[in-house]
Amino acid sequence: MEKQGRKLKKKFKIILVLVAILLIGIATLLGTYCYFKSPVSNDKKEVSIVIENGSTISDIAALLKKEGLIKDENFFKLYVKLKKVSNVYAAKYYFSPSMNLDEIINTLNEGGYNENEISITFKEGINMRGIAKLIKENTSNSEDDVYKKLKDEKYLNYAIEKYWFLTDDIKNSKIYYSLEGYLFPDTYRFNNKDVTVEEIFNKMLDQMEKELNKYKKQIENSKYSVHELITLASITQSEGYNEDDFKNIASVFYNRLKTGMALGSCVTSYYGVKKDMTDELLQKDIDASNPYNTRGNNPVSFPVGPISMPGAKALDATLDPIETSYYFFVSDKNNKLYFTKTLNEHERMITKLQNEGLWLEW
């Protein structure tokens, strides 16, 4: 009996070892699979490649690897087989190192560049008025088409249902433009000038969803609503000239909110009176009562909604914030920001800039 017990124990140990080896093997395979499927980098700069007639999957894999768009040629060829991609059309294609294998293969399946294709670049910090102008300039749509879609109740309900980050907050009647802040600024390609406003919006919302998915946990754990967070990100974007300042800018506004201070943001005053940032901001603009203005005699504690389209850096600064002791910042005429901890320090900094001829005056 004792012998049999020892044999059973030995067999059990062997089984455990085999199971452990199997699990390690599976984990290694999964890790390898995920690694080679993932993007090469976060670089969104597009690279154009031309696939010639008669190119094989091996030729395409070699070209993609050479341009730094995939991690491994053999894995790419294997993955293409798994996806059952048979024919790739000879054409010009656009890829970026930030695309994963699925996105690259989807692009190949779509058939590449066509001569009627249009490209529109929406820069970080652009507002809805700027987007409407660009859509008018580059497509068959008018600015009025854009504004009508922003008021289209049926479309807004559809968008709220489809995208987890859109809520009924965007339907507040005091908001100037319902999707302000939610259309991710980037370069987008469309088949031709007849693209609809809805198609443009959906593509931009799809990209915003990808960006915000990275911060879903932080958003869920925040004391602020997603609408408030996007609003803060838009203010951070509009206040900053240099992306390196975004983290400190966001921390200033978080610190002010914690202590009950007014946000006191000039960019909300501009937006509230529908002025561009290049316009002169008058005292009457600062004192104007509107649902966005956080300065003046009767400031709102929080703008009713976003004031621009925040990019990736501004979103990161707001959704993954740092802690500082800063409560103030001021810009010189060269767009350099100076951060300070107290009102006294802030006022001294302004005096210093004035004395040095660096103070920005209209």
Task: Spell out what each predicted region is.
Residues 1-3:
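N-terminal targeting leaders characterized by basic, low-complexity, disordered sequences
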Residues 5-44:
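N-terminal type II signal-anchor transmembrane helix
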Residues 10, 93, 326-327:
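Short non-domain terminal segments
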Residues 22-28, 44-58, 123-128, 264-280:
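Short N-terminal secondary-structure initiator segments
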